[in-house]
């Protein structure tokens, strides 16, 4: 199939710039004929006792660092305890061995790669990289969230190739609350546990603790796996022949308990509902002859129409970009023609797209 087969017209005003007023107040589109548009807090009406929801419990880290000199880096993947790959903007301003100081901590540029990718090393005093990021980093919002300058930026002092940043902040805010304060909460699922993602597994953003409690009370099970979402999730497909596209790799983990719960539910004929494309990709990557295997691994699975699914019966997901690998995935899962028609309906109904947008519940075709 061609890349152009997965294109559709999306009005820019439907790209959600902010989350809904409450997590579960977003819209939910049930992919039946005709489609049913409801509120997410009604999702329990479309599930049944014995269903198994599989969630991605990865936690978004504050992966964006402002280095001063109008340079920003977004961490991508952990390489070792003190080294990460990252994307720099603009990368041309950086050189190998450049050092950036955050109080008494140091970030060193160790390698420059193609397409703005770099490698960095953290020299920290008595704190972990995640603790450092919690103090100095910002939530890494996707590039399509374009707001006015309302984020906080650090004060920087530059001496030669060394830049010193302190913990003073210049606040610019249109809402009485900086965007980072709100995003720190809303760009994170309520059940996130394991730090490592640089973008949110967004299908889970709609769930509240109250909804999770109600699902449990109705006999709807839940279990958790981990996929750390990398920055590559936003990379566009640039080849017209989609099968020439090279997927990014991401770290995944499934515990023995989770694998046992999923396999038992499958054996008993219970419905498996993947919450998000990250969950579905992890399940399919781990599955061998219909059995989900426990373990930690990296995946670069690229799911396109014709793929033979072995795990989930349903998929809860947000609305995706035209010509994206995730739109290709849902076309593979729920039907090429059906998804184009569903998206036309969603656009007509002015549903909100992408990370802070609305959700849809799909059945496997």
UniProtKB/Swiss-Prot annotation:
It holds the Pfam family Queuosine_synth. Disulfide bonds: none annotated. Its main location: cytoplasm. Keywords: Cytoplasm, Queuosine biosynthesis, S-adenosyl-L-methionine, Transferase. It catalyses: 7-aminomethyl-7-carbaguanosine(34) in tRNA + S-adenosyl-L-methionine = epoxyqueuosine(34) in tRNA + adenine + L-methionine + 2 H(+). One of its GO terms (biological process) is queuosine biosynthetic process. GO terms for cellular component: cytoplasm. Pathway: tRNA modification; tRNA-queuosine biosynthesis. Its EC number is 2.4.99.17. One of its GO terms (molecular function) is S-adenosylmethionine:tRNA ribosyltransferase-isomerase activity. It is found in: Cytoplasm. Transfers and isomerizes the ribose moiety from AdoMet to the 7-aminomethyl group of 7-deazaguanine (preQ1-tRNA) to give epoxyqueuosine (oQ-tRNA). HAMAP family: QueA. Monomer. Belongs to the QueA family. This is S-adenosylmethionine:tRNA ribosyltransferase-isomerase. It comes from Rickettsia rickettsii (strain Sheila Smith). The gene is queA.
């Amino acid at each position: 199939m061609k890349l152009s087969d997965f294109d559709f017209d999306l009005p820019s005003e439907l790209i959600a710039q902010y989350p809904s007023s409450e997590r579960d107040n977003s819209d939910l589109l049930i992919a039946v004929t005709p489609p049913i548009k409801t509120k997410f807090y009604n999702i329990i009406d479309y599930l049944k006792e014995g269903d198994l929801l599989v969630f991605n419990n990865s936690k978004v880290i504050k992966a964006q660092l402002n280095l001063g000199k109008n340079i920003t880096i977004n961490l991508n993947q952990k390489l070792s305890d003190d080294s990460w790959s990252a994307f720099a903007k603009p990368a041309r301003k950086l050189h190998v061995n450049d050092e950036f100081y955050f109080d008494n901590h140091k970030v060193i540029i160790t390698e420059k790669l193609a397409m703005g990718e770099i490698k960095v090393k953290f020299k920290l005093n008595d704190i972990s990289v995640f603790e450092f990021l919690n103090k100095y980093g910002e939530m890494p919002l996707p590039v399509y969230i374009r707001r006015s300058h309302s984020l906080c930026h650090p004060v920087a002092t530059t001496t030669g190739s060394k830049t010193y940043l302190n913990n003073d902040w210049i606040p610019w805010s249109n809402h009485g609350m900086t965007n980072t304060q709100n995003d720190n909460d809303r760009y994170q699922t309520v059940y996130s546990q394991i730090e490592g993602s640089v973008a949110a597994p967004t299908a889970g953003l709609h769930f509240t603790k109250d909804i999770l409690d109600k699902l449990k009370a109705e006999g709807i099970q839940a279990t958790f796996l981990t996929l750390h979402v990398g920055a590559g999730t936003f990379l566009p497909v640039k080849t017209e022949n989609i099968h020439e596209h090279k997927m990014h790799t991401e770290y995944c983990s499934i515990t023995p308990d989770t694998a046992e719960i999923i396999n038992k539910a499958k054996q008993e004929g219970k419905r498996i509902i993947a919450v998000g494309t990250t969950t579905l990709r992890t399940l399919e990557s781990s599955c061998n002859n219909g059995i989900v295997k426990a373990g930690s691994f990296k995946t670069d699975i690229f799911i396109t129409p014709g793929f033979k699914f072995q795990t989930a019966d349903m998929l809860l997901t947000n609305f995706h970009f035209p010509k994206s690998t995730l739109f290709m995935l849902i076309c593979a899962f729920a039907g090429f023609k059906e998804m184009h028609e569903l998206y036309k309906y969603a656009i007509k109904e002015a549903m909100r797209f992408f990370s802070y947008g609305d959700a849809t519940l799909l059945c496997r075709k």
